[in-house]
Amino acid sequence: MASVAAWLPFARAAAIGWVPIATHPLPPPPMPKDRRKTDDEKLLINVSGRRFETWRNTLEKYPDTLLGSNEREFFYDEDCKEYFFDRDPDIFRHILNYYRTGKLHYPKHECLTSYDEELAFFGIMPDVIGDCCYEDYRDRKRENAERLMDDKLSENGDQNLQQLTNMRQKMWRAFENPHTSTSALVFYYVTGFFIAVSVMANVVETVPCGHRPGRAGTLPCGERYKIVFFCLDTACVMIFTAEYLLRLFAAPDRCKFVRSVMSIIDVVAIMPYYIGLGITDNDDVSGAFVTLRVFRVFRIFKFSRHSQGLRILGYTLKSCASELGFLVFSLAMAIIIFATVMFYAEKNVNGTNFTSIPAAFWYTIVTMTTLGYGDMVPETIAGKIVGGVCSLSGVLVIALPVPVIVSNFSRIYHQNQRADKRKAQRKARLARIRIAKASSGAAFVSKKKAAEARWAAQESGIELDDNYRDEDIFELQHHHLLRCLEKTTDREFVELEIPFNGQPKRPGSPSPMASPAHSTNSAAGLLQSCCGRCCSQRYQACGKYMPAASNAQNSQNNQPMDGTYLVEASF
């Protein structure tokens, strides 16, 4: 039978014309070269209820990890004959594939922190992540680190806000976060207003305001209304000087503050005014002062403290320093090459503007930036060809780093948006917690307050109606639960109140005022006479909630008692 079983596949192959019919059974199959060793065995790994099977030699490829070393024996379950790990089974699937294929992949849908924790638990370094996933992993890692840093700084800022005891610390926080207090917000808007006034005055003073008396040419407004513009400039400089001195006083590290970019801008913006006060009317010195007044335009950079978009743009340019350096280097190299070629292509033309290679720089820059002023135009065919190639090269060179800059700007912008959103959510959450605490506290004490008010009204002889009781939130919940109980049990429950005189009263009837002398037995008798056996059973179950426990206690304390009981109505 075994020979027939061995012959049948061979005969089937011969029937379709593959090989001729053989008279002998098939030989034994050859031993595969990659057949596993006899000491290899199949291992069963249970990860949070999900079982994985693999070979021992597969795990021992990486002996420096947890699964590849003898440390895995600490997780071996003798009863189930398996290794048990209380970890994430979805991430473990990628870890096991790393042992099988030698390539570690990063799943984009998984949490980065959980993924790193699983790798650290199994002793796998994140550096072995494959090239196909490493860029995504690195970007997610950077974004997560920035997000955690923002949260940490925000938490530290909130904690430091409670610990601010020094005036310098309070002033510095007011300068950096003007929305923390009203005074800081007012100073923030005042400085912004004077920055705008200073910039506008610097522009308007150059506008012509008439002709010079006895001279040719126009007279600018800065000279015609010199006193007005001087007063405006003085007021603005005084505000800027006070702001700079206050920031310098409140800075945690004054040396670091002085070396910062914004500090240098503040100094450059106010120094021309003070230098101008000490300059005489000498023409040479006045000419130098006019040149120095150009630095007043740097006051516009002070708006970066008042504009989040400008700060994001600055952070973007700072993060794209390498890409911008590549752009400048590429443009400089292309300008030199095309200017040299253009000079030799146009130097033999009479009256040409390309008199030298530096003179051709202007044409190359204008052409590569696609401006094309037309003041310098090539006349030879070779020069026109070079100009066309120069224009196309400029488009390509400038367009290459633009996507990187845009992506960085978008990343930083969304990061700031997420930070602002988290701050708003944190404030809203704290506000909800405060409201919940206040509401819950008011709800808990409302019962006590209502009871005290009821006692005071009864002692003064005022009859209470149901509207007064309905104002209590617990009474409303009580009646709501009664209605739900009636719907579910198809029974009607009546609330009977035992007033001071011992007479049962339904909720709709007025509450009579009488002496507090009554007993628990009389109340029980009234309930039994009113509702019979059901009331008796209900009274025995609910008697422990009555205000007084016995006649002896009532007579001893001589305190008024009342109570409300639920009975099943039998009509």
UniProtKB/Swiss-Prot annotation:
Cysteine disulfide links? none
Renumbered to this chain, region (Mediates dendritic targeting) spans 474-489
| Subcellular location field | Membrane; Cell projection, Dendrite; Perikaryon
Q: State the family it belongs to.
A: Belongs to the potassium channel family. D (Shal) (TC 1.A.1.2) subfamily. Shal sub-subfamily.
How this chain assembles, per its entry, is: Heterotetramer of potassium channel proteins. Interacts (via C-terminal dendritic targeting motif) with SIDL.
Q: Other remarks on record?
A: The segment S4 is probably the voltage-sensor and is characterized by a series of positively charged amino acids at every third position.
List the membrane topology term(s). Multi-pass membrane protein
Query: Which cellular components does GO assign to this protein?
Result: dendrite; membrane; perikaryon; plasma membrane; synapse; voltage-gated potassium channel complex
Under the heading InterPro entries, the entry gives:
BTB/POZ_dom, Ion_trans_dom, K_chnl_volt-dep_Kv, K_chnl_volt-dep_Kv4, K_chnl_volt-dep_Kv4_C, Shal-type_N, SKP1/BTB/POZ_sf, T1-type_BTB
Keywords, sorted A to Z: Cell projection, Glycoprotein, Ion channel, Ion transport, Membrane, Potassium, Potassium channel, Potassium transport, Transmembrane, Transmembrane helix, Transport, Voltage-gated channel
User: So where does this one cross the membrane?
Assistant: 186-204, 229-250, 261-282, 290-308, 324-345, 385-406
What protein does this entry describe? Potassium voltage-gated channel protein Shal
